[in-house]
Each structure stands twice: as C-alpha cells, then as structure tokens.
C-alpha cells in the first residue's frame, strides 16, 4: 500500500496516540508514526506539541526516517526556536556520520532552519563540510553558506566562509564549482560592490572547464556568472564565446537562453566586420527558432526574450520571419507576441508575405487578436514606406467588411498613416466618413474627428460632421472632447466666415460648462489666442506637425541593454528591470552591456564614439586644505568704508582688511567681473493683476515654481554680539543670489558691513560688495540680496556644498557656515541632445551610477517634469514601460559637471526611484537631496 493512506484518516484527538507511537521501542512503529505526523502537518494540522518526541527519533541509522524528522524540524523550528536547540547535538553528530548522504542532509537541514540561536552552532560543522572529502557534501555545504549569509551576513564574513567558497571554484568536481558559483552570485546580488566572485581569466577558465561536465542546472549557474564578466579585449571575448556556443544545442531551454545571454553580451565586444562575429549571428538563430517548437508556456517565455533580441540585433532573425507566423491553435498570448515580433522583422523584402498574413488574421474571431492585426498593418505602412499604398488598400478592404471593431481600429490606424504621409492618401477620406455613425469607441471617434479637422478644407460638409459630434459633447470622453475642440478651432481658422457660431459654441462648452481643468484651460488658450491675434493662432494651431516615428513602442536603449543582461529571467518576461518588481531590490547593482572601445561602428551607438568625450569636461575640485583654521586666524586691518558702488571696481576694496586675500594668494572678488554675471537691477514690484498672475508672485525673473529653500538662521545673535543673520540662496534670470536678513538685537547701531567667502567647492564668491549703506539701528532688520558668481578659487569642502563666510561690521568680525542648495548652481544650458544623452549614459562607468528612493511623493510624471524644468532639470525623453513612467533627464552645474538622471514613477506608488550617473559621483547625494526638496515643495 502507498503512503497515501496516511492522508485519509479522519480520526479526532489522535495527538496522544501519535505521541505513544513515537516513543515505541520498535523502529518500524516509530517510522510509521513520523509519517503520520508529516501527513498531518502537510494537510495543515498543528502537530507542534509533538516536537520533543519527533526530535528523539533523530537518533537512527534509517535514512528515510531521518529525512522525515528533518522535514518536521524545518517546518516547526521557527515557531519553536527554544525547542529546536534540542536537535543541535544530533545535527553536529550527523555532520560527522560516515555516510556522506547523512552528512550532507544534516548540513542542508541546518541551513534551512532560519533560527538565529541555531546559526552559531552551525559554523563548525559547516566549516568541516566545506572541506569534506565527498563532493556531494561539499556542494551541499556551498549552498548552505548562502542560506547562512541571508540569516547572519556578518557572521559568515567573520568566520571566513566566503574565502572557503572562493576556494571551491577551483574544486575538482564540476557540481561543487557550480554550487559555489551559485552561492557567491546570490550573495553578491545583495552586496553589488563586494567583488566576491573575483572574476579573472584564471577563474573564468576554471568555470569554462566545469561547464562541460556539470548538470544542466549547474551549467545555468556558471553561464549566468560568465555573463557578469567583462573580458579585457575582443580576443578573450571570442575565446569565451567559442566555448559557450555548444550550449546552444542543449535540450534544456533555460541553458539555451543563458548561453544566448552570454553571447549577446560578448557580441558587443567583437569587431563588427570580423568573420567570427557574422558566424556567431548565424549560430544564434537556429536555437531560438527551436525554442518555438516547445510547449506554449515555453514558447511565450522564448518569444518575450526574442522580442528583446530582435530590438537589439534584428539581423539575427531577419531571415526567419516565417517561424513567427501564427498557427490556428496557438494560445492568444503566443499569437500576440508573434505578431509583435513579425512587425519588428518586417522589411521591404518580406512585406508582401507579412501583409498577406495580417489580412488573414484580421478575419479571425478573436477580437483582441484582430485589433492587434489591424494595428500591425498600420505599423507596416509606417515602417516600410514602399508598402504604404498596399497597406492602405488592405485597410480599405477591411473597412468594407463593416465589422464594427475592425472598422474602428482601421480608422485609428489610418490617422497615423496620414500623419506619416501627409497629403498622400486623403482621397480615402470620403470612404471613412461613410462609417461615422458606427463609431462608438473613444479612440476611433477621436481619430475620425482629427481627420475631419485636419483636412476640413477638403471635406465639403466638415462643419456638419463636427457639429454632429458636438451634440453630445458632455457625454464624450475627455480625449474626444479635447480633439473635437482642436478640430473645430482648425475648421474656424480655415473657414472663418462659415463657422464662427460653431467655434463660439464649442469654446463656451469647454470653458463655461465643463468641470475638466484640462479642457477648460485649452479652451481659454484658444479663446485668448483667437481674440488677440488670429494670425498667430493660425501659425500655432495649423503649424506643420512632426512626422511620427517608425517604432513607437521600442524599449528605451538603456533599459534594453539592461534587459539583455537579464535574458532568461523574469525581468526579460516582464520587460522590466528587477528593481521594478522585486521588493527590496533597489540596492541591486544594475547591469549594462559592455562598450567595445576599439570600434567606431555607428550602428552600435546612435552617435559617434567621440560624442560623449566632446562634452565639456567638469572642473576638477581640488582637495580641501585646513581652511577653517586659517579663516579663524585672520589678521584683520581697520574697517573699510564701503562706498556706494555703481560700477564693478572691486580690486581696491579688501573687505576683511587683507587677511582672507593673503590666505588664498589672490583677491576673492576679481577686479572686473564679466557682464554675464553682472546683477540686474531689481525693479520695484508694483502689484497688478496680470503681473501677479503670471510672474511677479514668484520673484523677479524666477521661473514659476522654481524652488527656494526656506530661510534658516545662519548666525545667531548670541554668537555675533547681537547681529543675527538668516538667509537662503536663489537662482533668478541666470544669476545666483544670497538672500539675507540682517537683524540688530544689540543696544548699539551697526555700520561698515562687509562680507567675504572662503574657498569652496564651486568657486562661489560675491559679485558686488555688501550693500548696506545706512546704519542698522537696534531692533531694526534689513533684507539684502547679494549677487554671486562662480569665478572664485576652488577647494573641495566637506560637505561638498559647505560655504564658510566672514562678515565684518564696526563691532567685530563674525564667522559662520551655511549649505548651498545645489539647485541654485543648475545652469540654463543643461539640456542634452537625446543622442548625446544616450552615448554619455553608456560612456559613464556603471560604478558611477547611484540609486535613491524619493518617498511619499504624489505627483504625476508631467507635474514632476514641469517642476524640475522650472529648476533647470530638463526632461530629455519620457517613456511608459508596462504602466511605469520613466523620465530621462539632464542637468549641468556651474562648474561644467553634467548629471544624467532616470526617474521611475509608478502610478499609485508614492515612492519614486531615482538613478543618477555622473563623472563625479560624490555630487549625486546632493542632487538627490535637491530632487527630494523640489518635488516635496
């Protein structure tokens, strides 16, 4: 009889009987009792009260019974840690058993018992097992180290287990090597900068030797490890590729994908014009095609990975498009993936076959698949210009079928074709207008309205058509309302005499009867534009539109490179990096493809190899000396009266009596400051409705929404003989200002004010003298706006944005430090070209990339982008990947340091992920603080 009998009992109150059986003298009875306990545990019954009795059964030579007891222990040790200690002696004894199976079983079980009290007893047995004579024990112990590290990382390092793991890479048994690699890889995932694996040519050679002899899962561990290695040159990369290539013919699809991952990464390092490179591309195609003959689930995973490969290197599968033709019995999820890849591989050579297939798919019964097929025809027209006419003809044939969802999808697609090829296929508009009554989906209605508005001059009854949509204006979706508003304004600009009443009607509906702020705002913009300057309105609304791109759903190149490094993992199926869906993975080191420095192949990068290096090199910040000591020991001369200065003649004015100038060996404030940094005179602010509405409420010349840190007390009165200074920094009209408030809390008046800065990280100095021309009487305050520039001497401070200031008056000299918020150092020309951004991101070393969490932020991507742009942080590109908004941004500091940023925003998640890359990574922490401040204010 099988063991299933243990699961069929319905007895009540059997714990007492089991307890008696567990203490029976006969071995067979005890084994039967333990099986019953395990069965009860499996179906969810609480048998924890039998813990001492089950532990007593550990003292046996029967391997089956021992396994059952260990299984029980693993399940209940966490809930009964004090009782689990009882089993420690038995574990230690089993680790020295003559039978290697029992030794391995004992160390594996101890690793699975996640109880801190037990881990300290595990160290000695584990150390012995790592050096055990039997390879089965050694490979089990290797995995145990990773489990122990997860429980107590510090103890693993202190006990030297990581060194023992590294030694196992040179083990004679390939499975021991594979498990050691797996354990080290797992540990290094959570410690990305630890370099635990120490991958060098010698170790790589050992791994490649073991690769041929270990099991399939061992091969996967080794291949994944190889994919993290960066060969020193293309010769080494080719050597590794030659030894990995045989794995492409393996029966296990996971091994094949891991091998593909290694080869895809190392292809980056091979010369594009070499014979081996082209041969390797040809070798990659057959195994990928073979994966599509497996089960549907395997096919889907393979297709998701192939989608990435085709985006990176379409030439690999360009001759294999037929394997992606849909079969009638494919599940819908496989069909949709195949369709996507077909479009990516479509070219002038195969477009006839592809269109014939797509037309057939459009007659299927599955609505989602049909919609995607119709959309695919439009994508073909946009991608392959020579096929556009044939695609339009195919779409017209589909419209004639009068199948509602086919017609609606076709109209959406035709709108995009009109955008791509303006003034070419407008003859079909009449056919489209025949189907107006059947359109009930927002996308289709919006597309049709756009077409009517765009080509209103060619449609005789355009006003009647748009008026028919206007009848149910408030019942339409926002998308349709916005499109209709714009279309009627276009119609008015083309036929003003005939449509004046219509445009007034839609503007009234949008501005007075609508609760939607987007619609209302657009309505007001059009209304003001039309009423003030119709000529400008025409130029704005009827301006030439940019052509739409061929591929609108391509993955961003930097993300694509990262996903290529994760082929065969869940990230490649989700098309998201691991930190987007694995909880607590924000510290994981992000992977990137290597850069082949020996090639100037423009196909690899959208710009030449010199693009990134042509950027302005950041100023090197020298190390900080012992500045504070010198600053506090200034030999101050007699006070100097500061005249009212209208020009910039500053060379003769030594603000602090010569001490600070002698410290730095030159005047802090240059004798002549370029006009670029000359402060603009600040006009008096006269309150008026329009001024307040548009600009002056945010400060003269400051971008609306520009962040200004709240004023802080820099120098308390108790430390400055009654003088209190509070302040902040601002950035206005391209200039930096130090906004200060001086308060006299002493009993005597204060005069003869002067200010000077110490050397600092960004060379910040005053552009003009401190302009306090009247005595500061007791209990009086005065606001001072001091213009600054960054032409002064540079010395690295700690922290980096620290500014040491000396202020003099008729009483004494006072010293204080304040922190410059880095956003005031962001310059206006910090917007990179898109291609330069991509090349620079790749060129900056991966170790310079730092990742931060911006928590509790509830803004959408557009608001975030707008807020940051007001502070000279420019959004280069915005993508939506699987519902996640990704903003790619650049900014530039006054000293020429560029910072590149990737901001990930998941709608509904208040925590954003910010990745920063720059050539001076010590700046990143301060940039993150600025991002956090801007977005939370």
UniProtKB/Swiss-Prot annotation:
UniProt keyword annotations, A-Z: Acetylation, Cell membrane, Coated pit, Endocytosis, Membrane, Phosphoprotein, Protein transport, Transport
Localization per Swiss-Prot or TrEMBL: Cell membrane; Membrane, Coated pit
Chain segments carrying region Interaction with ARRB1: 841-937
Tissue: Expressed in the brain (at protein level).
Pfam families in alphabetical order: Adaptin_N (PF01602), Alpha_adaptinC2 (PF02883), B2-adapt-app_C (PF09066)
A GO BP entry: intracellular protein transport
Residue positions, PTM Phosphotyrosine: 737, 928
Organism, scientific name: Homo sapiens (Human)
Recorded coiled-coil stretches: none
Post-translational events: Phosphorylation at Tyr-737 by SRC occurs at the plasma membrane in clathrin-coated vesicles (CCVs).
One Gene Ontology cellular component annotation held by this UniProt entry: membrane
Quaternary assembly: Adaptor protein complex 2 (AP-2) is a heterotetramer composed of two large adaptins (alpha-type subunit AP2A1 or AP2A2 and beta-type subunit AP2B1), a medium adaptin (mu-type subunit AP2M1) and a small adaptin (sigma-type subunit AP2S1). Interacts with EPN1. Interacts with EPS15; clathrin competes with EPS15. Interacts with SNAP91; clathrin competes with SNAP91. Interacts with CLTC; clathrin competes with EPS15, SNAP91 and PIP5K1C. Interacts with LDLRAP1. Interacts with AMPH and BIN1. Interacts with ARF6 (GDP-bound).
Protein name: AP-2 complex subunit beta
